[in-house]
From Swiss-Prot:
Its main location: nucleus. This is Programmed cell death protein 2. Induction: By irradiation and dexamethasone. GO terms for biological process: apoptotic process; positive regulation of apoptotic process; positive regulation of hematopoietic stem cell proliferation; programmed cell death; regulation of hematopoietic progenitor cell differentiation. The gene is Pdcd2. It comes from Rattus norvegicus.
Amino acid sequence: MAAVVPVTVELGFVEEAPAWRLRSEQFPSKVGGRPAWLALAELPGPGALACARCGRPLAFLLQVYAPLPGRDEAFHRSLFLFCCREPLCCAGLRVFRNQLPRKNAFYSYEPPSETGASDTECVCLQLKSGAHLCRVCGCLAPMTCSRCKQAHYCSKEHQTLDWQLGHKQACTQSDHLDHMVPDHNFLFPEFEIVTETEDEIGPEVVEMEDYSEVIGSMEGVPEEELDSMAKHESKEDHIFQKFKSKIALEPEQILRYGRGIKPIWISGENIPQEKDIPDCSCGAKRIFEFQVMPQLLNHLKADRLGTSVDWGILAVFTCAESCSLGIGYTEEFVWKQDVTETP
């Protein structure tokens, strides 16, 4: 009988990085800032990147570079996750997949240079394809300032925001607009996501250590009380303890990647069943690919806008076939699980 080959889990951590490492031509995995789009054409439009609840533009949360070995059409492959920054709408989540063959219209056939360019370069507001990007969020921008004809936006909301934060004064200085992009307090802080393989031995060892500590703390407790405690231990407690033991060795992990594995849940409530995960538009089933951990919230500084972006787990499910539908961006599925409040 052939040995079962375990599927490795890659853990993601945030790390400061020079700006050049987070640009499209470096194929980054990253948090925050503007999206480093993969295909530089056929980007998702404003309608696809609007909150289904409030209609406001979604903010770019993170992207994961996840090529599929042995799949020529997915030699380059990235997943882009967006969320709503409004306090009542942080369930407004959307995720998109994009993939390209090694030989494509946008990037060199050879690997990118490891030497960085100057980090003083201006914000990229127009792609090589000619598509304009929003000055506020870096997404596709079909709207244009009617006065200067040089500033582009994804929505009326972002045009108004930019006008209030300086474009009103800079509008007549169109030659310098690329160098005059203010901080709109809309983007999340930008970090590179670096990965390492999870040590499969760790969680069991930690769990046994935790168990020993618990046993030690229960010395002298009457047997009747122990029986009562055991009866009241809920499935919820068990799942949360399993979650804690799983991440104990690497508590700073903000992402877990493992295509086709099972996610780890933080709560016994709101765990999706197979019927809850819609099939891909191509007809194939979707499988789990990665999850965003609550630890990422510590790095987002979401409170600076007075908002309350929050989650327990964000689990991303993608087409099992990773179907190729041209160079466009295919929407996938994200499941949000909140942290259950204990009484």
